[in-house]
A protein has these predicted regions:
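Conserved, mostly hydrophobic/aromatic
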Residues: 22, 133, 167, 171, ...
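N-terminal pre-triad scaffold of radical SAM enzymes
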Residues: 150-172
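Cys/His-coordinated zinc-binding microdomains
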Residues: 175
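Core AdoMet radical
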Residues: 1, 16, 178-201
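Glycine-rich beta-alpha loop elements in corrinoid/cobalamin-binding modules
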Residues: 1-112, 116-123
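Alpha-helix capping and helix-loop boundary segments enriched in small/acidic/polar residues
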Residues: 3, 24, 158, 162, ...
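Flexible loop/turn segments at secondary-structure boundaries
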Residues: 1, 32-34, 126, 140-141, ...
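Short, charged low-complexity linear segments at domain edges
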Residues: 129-156
Length: 201
């Protein structure tokens, strides 16, 4: 969706427009990625995969008219936002409001002759799902591309342990609620202690 780019100091169209990706998965991607892989394994053509929660894709106004849902939220178009910053602010308000709902609506935004479609998110993970997600053999190391470079933030988080996902906040300086959702999903005590033990060994 239309967003402010700090480096270029201007509003940019949705990432789908510039990347030309077939689909984007937003937020924490375990559930949507599994759903996408399951559809592809069944042989569903990629062009027909439109309803997976927590995904976004490009469509056309004609196609969206045929697939309209009663509670769809139609944002001001990208072009309208370029002309009026208050319209962009109103769009952002809708996005924030939907991120605070357990049952959010689908969000649509016209950009030129295309429509960005953002499906609502999955419900928060259960404790068991979150435990399973943290049970993979993560290395706890920086990405290999840094090749021995000093990463000051890594020193701070090297031994940190996530005990939950999500944040009900929405602080201007932080994007955790945008990435992880506004609802808290907690790990079990056993899962947390298992990770702490692994770090200390």
């Amino acid at each position: 969706l239309t967003h402010y780019d700090y480096w270029q100091d201007k509003l940019k169209p949705g990432i789908l427009i510039e990347s030309r990706a077939d689909m984007l998965i937003y937020g924490m991607g375990e559930k949507p990625l599994r759903s996408l892989v399951a559809e592809l394994k069944k042989g569903t053509p990629f062009s027909e995969i439109k309803s997976i929660p927590q995904t976004a894709y490009l469509s056309t106004p004609k196609d969206m008219a045929q697939m309209a849902l009663e509670d769809d939220i139609h944002l001001f178009s990208h072009e309208e936002c370029l002309q009026d910053k208050l319209k962009q602010a109103k769009n952002f308000r809708h996005i924030e409001e939907e991120s605070n709902k357990m049952e959010a609506s689908r969000i649509l935004q016209i950009v030129g002759d295309e429509v960005i479609v953002v499906n609502p998110p999955f419900p928060p993970m259960t404790e068991a799902e979150l435990d399973a997600s943290f049970d993979y053999p993560y290395t706890r190391l920086p990405h290999p591309k840094y090749k021995g470079k000093t990463i000051s933030a890594f020193d701070m988080i090297q031994y940190s342990v996530n005990i939950h996902r999500g944040c009900f906040g929405g602080c201007a300086f932080c994007t955790i609620s945008a990435h992880q959702g506004k609802f808290i999903a907690s790990r079990s005590k056993q899962s947390i202690l298992k990770e702490v033990k692994a770090i200390t060994e």
